[in-house]
């Protein structure tokens, strides 16, 4: 029997595993970097062990330190979560060599499926050894790849050699393995996967399908179960192939087999992920199971029932990220003041009200999941819940999620992996609520600050300025004997937390929350502007300011003050949340100041460089 589990991970998945362990009466152990010392997963655990340092390479990717932590804390089992070391066969061996229970598949199964070429061989899928014009387009892919790295689409035979060379170089850099292979390129196919669960007694469950076609930069955004619109033949084929993949490597535990389904309904095997997936909650909702609890039972040697439980209804999940669509999807940091969704929605998160969202790790704040008898009901429920959710803090992708769920192409289940290539610009176009600044101003009228326009005569117009969706807006109102008034609308009610406005005969209700100069009016985020700007905050035209806190990792070779630069030319690179972000010249001109140096830690708004346009 497992009595104490260390989760070799952080954030949302660590909290998720701890929840199931608590329900089972199992003691929990967390590990944490210095940056995560006060993180929610640390606060939830019964015990916690520090991994000195901040970078993932020094902490969550140090299998030796994590095994020592498990032994020191008295854990008898290790759950890897997902990401980090979850698909590292050497780590799995180190855990078992230390006499601990590994809550995952055998190391040999991890190794076999780590190589996409080896996985295809096990399933009898022949690679494209020789590419002809008839095979085009094709995809050059890293055998050990993932996340879009080490991949090149080839549409002309003349480009194949260069694509192979580039993919090999990228694969070596990203994965330390230069093996690549070529496969047919499925243009705008559907990403469909099968959840499997296997025990040590020969039983393998195929727990239905999931559709994860809505992806941006090869990262999943919205997932659902079951995959809609699959014909029974294809559904059976996908499940059978997934079970066959698991049996081919004597798999044990939870895993996912991924496919691309083309426009003709043909399935193309992608890979097998030998771990729990981020999107596992939609499968749990549909089948009424706890996959983590089943992982624990399988690891203890218990047998699964012969058949999985029946599926019921439909579930949809959306990933809420702290990222800014208006600034190249740059990860956002800062205080998360409040995160809450309406009742009936599952929220898996690794943070809570008051937590600081840092720069060091993945910017996902939470996963929101809705389950209902039908797909249409689940989609409607999730979209409405996200729209009404309180997400007070850094800028997020909330609007993208709501608009995606309500897009006609998604609603009719006609989406594919090219969805965001076609629609991202429209889905992220600013659509500010014109009444939001007035609601913010009226709520703020109950207290005066430097952000308001003070008047000796209350009946004179009051003016407050805000930025909203990247643009500046003014709100004007008056104090009268009967209360607050504004031109063009009727102020039905106004206090610091609730404003009700009537415009064109329609009443609009706004819940308002303010945190310093940050104001949340319903789902709209505004920033209050001071009436008298601080002169010390002014910067010269052409100033390049850090869009996020991070580390300057490099400056363009040979770049010095006085150099001529072209508009769009990369000048330096910032690293934040495991991603590099280019800082480019805003105009053609002269670099008159260069303040950044490699290794420098910067905060939001730090002056990096100045380009004087010519």
Where is each model-derived feature located?
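Catalytic P-loop NTP-binding/switch module of NTPases
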Residues: 507-547
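Short acidic-glycine loop/turn motifs at beta-strand connectors
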Residues: 156, 198-203, 262-265, 372, ...
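Catalytic cores of soluble metabolic enzymes centered on carboxylation/carboxyl-transfer
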Residues: 242, 281-284, 289-488, 567-570, ...
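Residue-level recognition of beta-strand microenvironments
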Residues: 185, 350, 371, 494, ...
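Short amphipathic alpha-helical segments
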Residues: 149, 226, 362-368, 542
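N-terminal beta-alpha lobe that positions the nucleotide/phosphoryl donor
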Residues: 1-257, 261-277
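Structured functional modules or segments
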Residues: 535-614
